[in-house]
């Protein structure tokens, strides 16, 4: 089946997003009469006999689901669908990066559709409220802008080898320092704190603070910057928070802003923490000091490498499917388990995925280092595994993910009414 022939039945794919959004439980309200005709056309081309789904939206759907599952698990029957030529035009055998957003369009006419196309994300369902999940694999849903909602800095703090965690540092900062100039960089709700603890006076002058990786992906708006000695409601030992009007001004600079930003004023500041170090010019000698940045923190999309590499931005990758496709597969998975077909179908999907990837390689072969550790219905994790194949061209990896996404969406639609005899 060429892409042109597939476009003749594209109403089915266009209806997928509306189907999975509007269908709930036993309700079936996603497809139109035109979609029924498209379904009939597609099943004819798939050599699947008529399921009679037009006259009854319930029982025939069960038959249709059963036949589709049988079809998808027989690689000799669906082999054409796994080849990259499935998406190729008769006259122009190429696939653009925005194939999904160009041909599988939500029928809800969400005004954000242009944003979806610009972000070039993979998910199709419109989101009622775009928001950031701090503990996800950083493949955002189609309408989730990574910098759309504030984030608490303490949720991003990440301990690494040789570094004490954020909360354990609370007890350490309570303890009087035993030496001069002990630097620290911590986070709490709405605030980032950095400074130097000391048991003796620290002279005025220039001091530099390295911005850790977890903070380098943040920007802050409307921030107050001031001296403090409080961390999570406890008192930091070895710092001086008091100041007088006669004190010389203390300023600091960040890599993304060449201006001297004031400390201890009513000024509201907005700046990015990405790019390197904070350089602070201490105006007056203090026995240690702590500078607080208090404001609304958000993630910088152009600085968060996790957003592009699909690695977790807060912790090791977790089992969170942020495409929501697993929600629509729940009923299907329950039926597979109930009838003892779960392992059989999983093996079939693993073979299907490997066949699909092989078809994109030249010469056809499984790429070196490819190993799936997640189940087939965890689409985001499989996408991350595919996109991590550095020895495969990035555009090819993208096409693999988009191709697998369409097939998974089809299973989400048809598998909902799967009831094996």
From Swiss-Prot:
InterPro entries: Capsid_hemagglutn, Phytoreo_P8, Virus_capsid_a-hlx_vir. Capsid protein which self-assembles to form the outer icosahedral capsid with a T=13 symmetry, about 70 nm in diameter and consisting of 780 molecules capsid proteins. Disulfide bonds: none annotated. GO terms for cellular component: host cell cytoplasm; host cell cytoplasmic vesicle; viral envelope; viral outer capsid. Belongs to the phytoreovirus outer capsid protein P8 family. This is Outer capsid protein P8. SUPFAM superfamilies: A virus capsid protein alpha-helical domain, Viral protein domain. Keywords: Capsid protein, Host cytoplasm, Host-virus interaction, Outer capsid protein, Virion.
């Amino acid at each position: 089946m060429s892409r042109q022939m597939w476009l003749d039945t594209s109403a089915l794919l266009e209806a997928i997003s509306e189907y999975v959004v509007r269908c709930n439980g036993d309700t079936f309200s996603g497809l139109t009469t035109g979609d029924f005709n498209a379904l009939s056309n597609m099943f004819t081309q798939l050599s699947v006999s008529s399921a009679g789904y037009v006259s009854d939206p319930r029982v025939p759907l069960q038959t249709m689901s059963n036949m589709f599952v049988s079809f998808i698990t027989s690689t000799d029957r669906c082999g054409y669908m796994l080849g990259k030529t499935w998406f190729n035009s008769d006259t122009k055998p190429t696939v653009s990066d925005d194939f999904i957003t160009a041909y599988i369009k939500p029928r809800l006419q969400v005004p954000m559709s242009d944003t979806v196309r610009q972000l070039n994300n993979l998910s199709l369902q419109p989101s009622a409220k775009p928001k950031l999940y701090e503990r996800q694999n950083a493949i955002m849903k189609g309408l989730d802008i990574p910098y759309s909602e504030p984030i608490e800095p303490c949720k991003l703090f990440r301990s690494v080898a040789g570094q004490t965690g954020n909360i354990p540092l609370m007890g350490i900062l309570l303890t009087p320092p035993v030496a001069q100039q002990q630097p620290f960089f911590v986070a709490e709700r709405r605030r980032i704190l950095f400074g130097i603890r000391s048991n003796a006076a620290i002279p005025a002058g220039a001091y530099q603070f390295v911005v850790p990786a977890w903070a380098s992906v943040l920007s802050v708006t409307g921030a107050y910057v001031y001296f403090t000695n409080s961390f999570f409601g406890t008192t930091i030992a070895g710092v001086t928070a008091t100041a007088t009007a006669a004190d010389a001004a203390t300023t600091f600079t960040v890599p993304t802003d060449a201006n001297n930003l004031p400390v201890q004023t009513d000024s509201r500041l907005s700046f990015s923490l990405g790019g390197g170090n904070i350089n602070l010019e201490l105006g007056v000698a203090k026995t240690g000091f702590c500078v607080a940045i208090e404001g609304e923190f958000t993630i910088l999309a152009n600085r968060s490498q996790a957003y592009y590499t699909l690695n977790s931005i807060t912790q090791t990758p977790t089992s969170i499917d942020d495409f929501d496709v697993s929600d629509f597969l729940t009923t299907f998975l329950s039926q597979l388990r109930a009838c003892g077909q779960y392992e059989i179908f999983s093996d079939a999907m693993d073979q299907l995925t490997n066949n699909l990837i092989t078809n994109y390689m030249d010469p056809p072969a499984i790429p070196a280092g490819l190993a799936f550790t997640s189940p087939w219905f965890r689409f985001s994790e499989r996408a991350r595994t595919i996109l991590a194949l550095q020895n495969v061209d990035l555009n090819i990896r993208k096409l693999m993910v988009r191709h697998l996404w369409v097939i998974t969406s089809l299973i989400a639609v048809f598998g909902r009414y799967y009831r094996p005899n």
